[in-house]
Amino acid sequence: MDIPSVDVSTATNDGASSRAKGHRSAAPGRRKISDAVYQAELFRLQTEFVKLQEWARHSGARLVVIFEGRDGAGKGGAIKRITEYLNPRVARIAALPAPTDRERGQWYYQRYIAHLPAKGEIVLFDRSWYNRAGVEKVMGFCTPQEYVLFLRQTPIFEQMLIDDGILLRKYWFSVSDAEQLRRFKARRNDPVRQWKLSPMDLESVYRWEDYSRAKDEMMVHTDTPVSPWYVVESDIKKHARLNMMAHLLSTIDYADVEKPKVKLPPRPLVSGNYRRPPRELSTYVDDYVATLIAR
C-alpha cells in the first residue's frame, strides 16, 4: 500500500545539538512501554515478518530495506529483531566493509548491486550506498565532485530499482546527541558491546553538526515521492523497533501463504542389526552445566 512521505523537517531529534536547543534528550519524561507489552508485541510483529518472508518466497517479490542513521542510533538492534526468526536463505543482512582499492575504481553503486535480492529474497542493508552522503562527505573520503554526482544519480538509481520491481524502503534512525553520547559511554565499559565503539564513532561526537548538515542535504535530494525516507525517533530503543517494524509491514501488501500440512512418518521398528558404538570411543564435551548446578 502507498504510504505518504514523512516530513523530515519534524525530526528535530537529529539536528542541532541539545546544548544549543536547551534540552538533553527526547527520552526523559516520556512514558515508556512496559517490558511485558514490548515482548508480546515484538513477537507478534516477528510472526508477521515470517508471514512476509513466506509471501516473498512464494510470490517472487524482492524487498530491499535500508537502515541509516548516526552511530549508536539503534539500526543494528532493529535489524536483529526483524531477522531473529527469518530463514537466512530468504532474508539476509548486507553490511559492507570499507571499499577495497579495486572497488574504489568501480562505479560507486557497483558493489551494492551485487547484494541486491534475487526473486523471493529480502535484503536488509545495515548502512548502504548512502555512506557517500554521510561519513564519506563528512570525513573527506570522497571528492566534492563525487558527492555532487551521488546526489544527482541516487534518485535515478533508485528509480531504476523500483521500475524493475524491487520494493525499496528507506529508514533513518534519529537519535539525540545526549542519547548517543550516553550509549557510547555505556559501550565503553561493556565487555560484550565494547567492540561496537570505533574511532569513527568517537569522531562523530565532535562532528555532530557536520553530520546534521550532511543528513539534511541528503534528505533534500533523495527524499522523493517514489522513494521516500521514513524517520524513526530512536531515543527509546524499544519504541523505535516496534514503530519501525510495524510501519514497514504496513507499507507492503503481503498475504498469508497457505502452509502445507506436515505429517511425521512413523519411526521404523528397530531391526536389531544396529548397535551404537561404545561411549568411550567418542569424545564428548565436558558437562560444564553440572558445575553450575553444583554451586
Swiss-Prot record:
It catalyses: [phosphate](n) + GTP = [phosphate](n+1) + GDP. Its EC number is 2.7.4.-. This is GDP-polyphosphate phosphotransferase. The keyword Transport does not apply. The keyword Phosphoprotein applies. The gene is ppk2. Keywords: Kinase, Phosphoprotein, Transferase. Changing residue 74 to R: Loss of GTP-synthesizing activity and lack of autophosphorylation. Does not interact with Ndk.
